[in-house]
Amino acid sequence: MINDIKQLHKRYRLLVHLSNNHVYAQIIDDLNNRTVLSVSTLTPQVKSKLSITCNKKAAELVGEYVAQQALNFGIRNVVFDRGRKLYHGKVEVLANSARSFGLKF
């Protein structure tokens, strides 16, 4: 699946990872094999606004912050990579939050 994303889309990739305790989002440049930016519930700006770091509110804040940072870097269009997670719950909330703050995918 990742190879399909790399070959079909020459765009940045928004990778979402959920652990039992935290929510992570990264913008990856697959052409140059580097991570452009990374935001998680461990990021000080996000962590200071949360009391619980593994719920939908946390996912919403991570989506908002990753979209703001991406727009600061001049990144508007991304490919959404949810990994093996279903597009439901925290993944869906993060995606909708990133979309509402200006990312297009």
From Swiss-Prot:
The gene is rpl18. SUPFAM superfamilies: Translational machinery components. Part of the 50S ribosomal subunit; contacts the 5S rRNA. GO terms for biological process: translation. It comes from Cyanidium caldarium. Gene3D superfamilies: 3.30.420.100. This is Large ribosomal subunit protein uL18c. Keywords: Chloroplast, Plastid, Ribonucleoprotein, Ribosomal protein, RNA-binding, rRNA-binding. GO terms for molecular function: 5S rRNA binding; structural constituent of ribosome. One of its GO terms (cellular component) is cytosolic large ribosomal subunit. Binds 5S rRNA, forms part of the central protuberance of the 50S subunit. It is found in: Plastid, Chloroplast. Belongs to the universal ribosomal protein uL18 family. The keyword RNA-binding applies. InterPro entries: Ribosomal_uL18_bac-type, Ribosomal_uL18_bac/euk.
